[in-house]
Amino acid sequence: MSIDINNRLYTALVTPMFVDGSIDWGSFENLLRIQEYQGCGILILGSTGEALALDFDEQCEVVRFVTNLNLNVPIMVGVGGFQLTKQLQWIEFCQTQRVDCFLVVTPLYAKPGSASQTSWFKTVLDKAERPCMLYNVPSRTGVNLAEEVLTSLKDHPNLWALKEASGDIQRCARYQELAPNLVIYSGEDGLLPELADVGVKGLVSVISNIWPEQTKEYVKQSLAHQIAITDKVIWEVATRSCFSVTNPIPVKAWLAYSGVITTNTLRAPLLANELEDLSLLIGADSLVKDWFSHI
């Protein structure tokens, strides 16, 4: 079966865990099947999936587990770190599995400049045998994706898309201007309507862990420029509820509360008790479900 990677909605999936921190495969499959049922593309081992808190063997086990389920939606795998050789080894492993595409983040911690970024991304793209989505998220990496990366690599056969999560609408528009054939996805749930106005074609979402069906409708309306201002506010509230403390703490808390996964456990350095209560999530859940009931 051919998989279309140009899904308008990808869910950046959490990695469910037992209280002892081991991966909860039963909850993981439950979460994956829910996303598959709604037709959402799936991103595993991104920051929401706590990829860097898992060792290499665990990461490989996650990829094997997910791909062996033979889901009928596209599977994207996160590529991110500091040591280039390890990222290339990771890509090499993933390409032995049924992985459809990669999410490749700007190198972490080092804050590389234009030339360094371009060299890094070219090396990764050359290694990849799958379409790649670059990822600009300066709040996590400390640096924006350099414009030179796009001007230099926009015609690379393995460069497919960009996830833009700087929160800067004009920057997103500039990236689209520099690489007009690049498919740009919003990495900011609450900004999708505004980013759609400058050419964004989809969303890589955190909140769709909780509300996959409703988020699909939100994406549909946003990309069609049909979402009302009052409705947009609802999705801004929903987004804030999932980012009141560091992601994925709130999302895991709600999924455990609602019985989708067994616990809200995270790996160090994150602790579940940073979220003091569920009041924001309870309020957002009510708003989102009421909005959807009137569609």
From Swiss-Prot:
EC number: 4.3.3.7
Catalytic reaction equation(s): L-aspartate 4-semialdehyde + pyruvate = (2S,4S)-4-hydroxy-2,3,4,5-tetrahydrodipicolinate + H2O + H(+)
Keywords carried by this UniProt record: Amino-acid biosynthesis, Cytoplasm, Diaminopimelate biosynthesis, Lyase, Lysine biosynthesis, Schiff base
Lineage top rank: taxon: Bacteria
Binding-site residues, pyruvate: T48, V204
Pathway membership, UniProt: Amino-acid biosynthesis; L-lysine biosynthesis via DAP pathway; (S)-tetrahydrodipicolinate from L-aspartate: step 3/4
Gene3D superfamilies: Aldolase class I
Catalytic residues, chain numbering: Y135, K163
UniProt-annotated site: Part of a proton relay during catalysis, residues: S47, Y109
Assigned GO CC terms: cytosol
Task of the protein: Catalyzes the condensation of (S)-aspartate-beta-semialdehyde [(S)-ASA] and pyruvate to 4-hydroxy-tetrahydrodipicolinate (HTPA).
Sequence similarity: Belongs to the DapA family.
Classification via NCBIfam families: dapA
SUBUNIT field: Homotetramer; dimer of dimers.
Protein name (record): 4-hydroxy-tetrahydrodipicolinate synthase
Organism, as annotated: Francisella philomiragia subsp. philomiragia (strain ATCC 25017 / CCUG 19701 / FSC 153 / O#319-036)
